[in-house]
A protein has these predicted regions:
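Generic N-terminal amphipathic, Lys/Arg-enriched alpha-helix
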Residues: 3-16, 178-181
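Conserved phosphate/anionic-ligand binding catalytic regions in large, soluble enzymes, centered on
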Residues: 14-30, 254-271, 313-317
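Flexible, glycine/charged-enriched surface loops at secondary-structure junctions
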Residues: 38-42, 82-87, 108-111, 189-195, ...
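Signature of multi-pass transmembrane helix bundles
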Residues: 103-251
């Protein structure tokens, strides 16, 4: 298997709700699995990016939000074996028990450090045991488990993205041209696994469309003539994207296929391309190849920014990947993709991330609009030149 194909396959993961509270629930459930007796306290220590992203996130299978409730529900009813879908089997009585745990002041969330590097530490103390679970770098990568003072070593996830600290990440050893050569030449049968992302993300969209709790998607449905797939590609793309993201941040009971540890990234990198595929009649093979490119560009950017950065990676990283995917579907050149990247970087890079919340829906709509404009301008050879602003670069690896 091509190592880029393997990289995508490893990075794609189902995630129920926003990935940050999902990771907190996973860690809490894992810690609880090592303890017996009644829960006395739960302490959650987070890096700043994790703290920010989970602050007002909707928690799957409930109407609650935030890190405290994610940890409480993880302790009460989480199944750590399900990873980022740890809360998929929650019942109403579990929600009520978690609410009592929070109301009694038994759950405490602490800001551990200022960093874009993922860090979660959950301490579960009962009247019989104490367990400490630590996660670092990726959302489910357990690096340490300590039970009643005894350290247990847990094998970390194998990562093909790079080697030793400071070593160039695998994705950064490729130029944009080389990524496109891979896209053009990889056997399409090796890319079939990505179809699962469309199945999963479209089911999430349908959940958002049918939910009484969503608002943005219903407005965009009206703007799209009351149908999901209209002849207006961009409106269809915005509709699909917003519906899935809104469902996700509300915590509706359907997973997204995440990329770079984010369900919203996975949605933005895929569903607008599906709109283009349906409206314009592109082949499934074209869609899969465009999706692989979209994913890789997103991953390339995220390896620079960090998984939990201060800027909106959904719009900037996934949106840029999607813009390149649109150029690819339309038969554009590598130079045109460079132009689309410049247009995205020169326009929406200033968008901040204020955590996983309803605002992500609006950011997704903005990302679609910017990506379509960036791709269309680049196809007409109109782009922000390398001498200007944040786009300026003495020597750029991508595109050479």
């Amino acid at each position: 298997m091509n190592r880029l194909t393997e990289l995508i396959r490893e990075d794609m993961k189902p995630a129920l709700g926003v990935t940050e509270p999902g990771a907190i629930a996973f860690a809490a459930a894992k810690a609880r699995s090592y303890t017996n007796g009644a829960v006395l306290s739960v302490i959650v220590r987070l890096n700043s990016g994790m703290y920010k992203n989970a602050f007002t996130c909707g928690i799957p299978n409930s109407r609650e939000v935030g890190s405290e409730f994610a940890a409480a529900l993880g302790v009460i009813a989480g199944n750590w074996e399900l990873g980022l879908e740890a809360l998929s089997d929650v019942r109403q009585e579990d929600i009520e028990s978690a609410e009592r745990l929070v109301e009694q002041g038994k759950v405490q969330v602490v800001l551990q450090n200022i960093s874009s590097r993922i860090f979660i530490e959950v301490v579960v103390k009962t009247d019989e045991d104490e367990a400490v679970v630590t996660i670092e770098d990726t959302h489910t990568n357990i690096t340490s488990v300590v039970v009643n003072g005894e350290e247990k070593f847990i094998h970390s996830e194998k990562k093909k993205k790079g080697g030793k600290p400071g070593e160039k990440q695998l994705i950064h050893t490729y130029t944009l041209r080389q990524l496109c050569e891979y896209i053009d030449n990889e056997n399409v049968s090796e890319l079939e696994f990505m179809w699962e992302a469309y199945r999963m993300n479209l089911e999430l969209f349908e959940a958002g469309l049918s939910s009484e709790r969503t608002t943005f998607v219903k407005h965009l449905l009206k703007k799209n003539g009351g149908v999901v797939f209209s002849e207006e590609e961009q409106k269809t793309a915005s509709l699909l994207c917003s519906g899935a993201i809104e469902a996700r941040v509300l915590g509706l009971d359907k997973p997204a296929m995440s990329i770079t540890g984010s369900g919203a990234h996975g949605i933005i990198a895929t569903l607008p391309l599906y709109a283009a595929y349906k409206v314009n009649g592109y082949s499934k093979e074209q869609l899969l190849r465009a999706t692989a490119l979209s994913y890789l560009i997103c991953m390339y950017i995220k390896e620079y920014s960090g998984k939990l950065s201060a800027f909106c990676g959904c719009a900037i990283a996934a949106g840029t990947g999607m813009a390149c995917g649109l150029v690819y579907l339309r038969g554009g050149t590598v130079k045109m993709m460079e132009g689309a990247i410049n247009n995205m970087a020169g326009s929406i890079t200033g968008m901040i991330c204020d955590g996983g919340n309803q605002g992500c829906t609006m950011k997704g709509i903005v990302a679609v609009d910017a990506a379509y404009q960036s791709a269309e301008l680049a196809m007409d050879e109109v782009c922000v030149a390398n001498v200007h602003g944040i786009v300026r670069s003495e020597e750029r690896r991508v595109g050479k």
